[in-house]
Design a protein with these regions (language model features):
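C-terminal substrate-binding/catalytic lobe of Rossmann-fold NAD(P)-dependent oxidoreductases
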Residues: 31-137
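Active-site PLP-lysine loop of aminotransferase-like
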Residues: 9
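Short, small-residue-biased leader/transition segments that mark boundaries at the very start
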Residues: 1-2
Length: 137
């Protein structure tokens, strides 16, 4: 068994990735909507954008069929906030995932590890959440 590198093991981020993928697909069918991503992390975080922001931007860009801008903010002690914004002339849709504690990453890694028991192959967090999978809680 092998788990391909994941930018983020939070179960919430894995769900968020699927939600923004569907939103991007729907907004791609409409005219007049732009998208961008804003991420905020603690001041000591070295990479900008983060791996999670890069993965989410790739998801949204893939759904829209065009690249999106990413804004990175490093301040305070924020564990991680990712906001995808679909912006139209008369309305705006904001989708947000906010990690309130770094334990979510460890918990997600444990869920993924339990899910991997007895499996062979290369997997991602999307596989852990696939419709035919049982995610341990």
């Amino acid at each position: 068994m092998l788990f391909r590198s994941a930018p983020n093991f939070s179960i919430g981020v894995a769900v968020f990735d699927r939600v923004v993928a569907e939103a991007a697909h729907l907004f791609a069918q409409l005219q007049g909507f732009d998208a961008h991503l804003i991420e905020t992390h603690h001041a000591a975080k070295k990479d900008a954008p983060s791996g999670t922001a890069g993965a989410l931007a790739k998801t949204v860009s893939g759904g829209l069929g065009r690249p999106i801008p990413v804004t990175s903010i490093r301040t305070g002690s924020v564990p991680g906030t990712h906001e995808v914004i679909f912006d139209g002339a008369f309305e705006q849709v904001r989708l947000v995932h906010e990690a309130r504690d770094r334990r979510v990453f460890a918990e997600g890694a444990l869920v993924a590890a339990r899910w991997l028991i007895g499996k062979r192959g290369v997997f991602t967090m999307r596989d852990v959440l696939s419709s035919d999978s049982e995610v341990a809680s």
